């Protein structure tokens, strides 16, 4: 069970730790400290869920914690939702193996946050209530836009959940000795408990606690590494170059992507996909007003940026302290557990078994924080967008909507467990890439254009959104990851790893073309309503949810 925690840290919601599933290694010895910390963490978070359940009485409480989260708290929770085990272990592993390239990768994740800060956060909060579909459908036709938005959200949520569950099961099995199926079921049960009873309030505090633990653990590791080199970066880099097999090449870029098109596609997916992730967007509705939403992004960007700096130091520290140490290698000379275990081995090197146990607990917290946010986002898409607004046309009562949401949480739990078991032996890196690509190709264009382009109509949004979604899925299937590696064909039809460059362009062109050619009465009315939406987005007048709700 202790090893269960350690695995969590490697759980990989982002593309970075794709190859963890394919890597094999020896299981770690039993760590009693990790077992104790695991039990303490689960007990504490279940108590938080019980406390949150007493305060969660309405639909607003369940979806958005009543809008009572402060900007600082929300910024910390967003960071907890975004700083995945992949970010910690995956990027650290990239730095460990490739050096400078790992930093380039982390910048791709980080750069999306200023986009959210300057383009989206304020207007999103002023226009929406529970989901981003509230914003996209503000002046457009409710039913078709909400269906598209919900399906796009569910695609992203499902792919992320698969990544989380498979990653959790594999790593728990590797590190803790737990049976894979047992590990997946355990994560699924805890995920359902947090969201089912505690809603957004419990999810928020689990994410905040996880962020604090992860930042504290990473800070300690980075400080210990810098202490060894007398807090001199030149010494760190020189000694890392001296022991790394690639030598000075680790200080140069160029090893992560095979061609400029793939690099650009990946960059676009990481940059703009962040602004279309439903579980991230949903967090902006937990604060009282646009001012707090801006603060949320400001604090989140600071925490996340600081964290990525730490991962860079941790990666080079692993080169220095882990790679030359035979105790972290198996009989073949490979790193035990694969390169994604570099940061975990570094925890043992700088802090012994006690700190290794702490990092194991943080790993488990990382899994639960991310899957809880994903589950709530998926449940709200079904209950609020599909049931309450698309099916019931906005006439569903609050009690029925909450019932549907909680039923959806349980169903998502079963689906997550089932998919985790089904995809046990599958390389799931492409799922994470597809999740970002779908978010960038379907959700992001609809959100951006609906808020900023007065000529957007329902017809344009639907055509552009569906084209972006379908193109992203089709190109990923025809690409080398699925078409060649999984389906066994000799050559891919689409030669690049990621589709975002093309699917995003198609989505924007489709939205533009079918909007400017829309001369219907409905289209003209939607253009006229943009001014009302613009005033609301800038001032928050008529805002429907917050502390006073």
Swiss-Prot record:
Q: Per its UniProt record, what Gene3D superfamilies does this chain match?
A: Sodium/glucose cotransporter
List the Gene Ontology MF annotations in alphabetical order: acetate transmembrane transporter activity; glycolate transmembrane transporter activity; symporter activity
Query: Where does it sit, as one GO cellular component term?
Result: plasma membrane
Q: Could you name the domain of life of the organism this protein comes from?
A: Bacteria
What CDD domains does the record tag this protein with?
SLC5sbd_u4
The GO biological-process annotations, alphabetized, read as: plasma membrane acetate transport; sodium ion transport
Pfam family for this entry, one = SSF
**Which terms are listed as keywords in the entry?**
Cell inner membrane, Cell membrane, Ion transport, Membrane, Sodium, Sodium transport, Symport, Transmembrane, Transmembrane helix, Transport
Q: Give the way it sits in the membrane.
A: Multi-pass membrane protein
Ranges that cross the membrane: 32-54, 75-97, 102-124, 145-167, 182-204, 211-233, 263-285, 298-320, 361-383, 404-423, 428-450, 462-484, 494-516
Signal peptide (from-to)? none
Compartments (UniProt record): Cell inner membrane
Query: Is this entry keyworded Nuclease?
Result: no
Instruction: State the InterPro entries in the record.
Output: Cation/Ac_symporter_ActP, Na/Glc_symporter_sf, Na/solute_symporter, Na/solute_symporter_CS, Sodium:Solute_Symporter
User: What's this protein's family per the entry?
Assistant: Belongs to the sodium:solute symporter (SSF) (TC 2.A.21) family.
Its biological purpose is as follows: Transports acetate.
State what protein this is by name. Answer: Cation/acetate symporter ActP
What lineage does UniProt assign to this protein's organism? Bacteria, Pseudomonadati, Pseudomonadota, Gammaproteobacteria, Enterobacterales
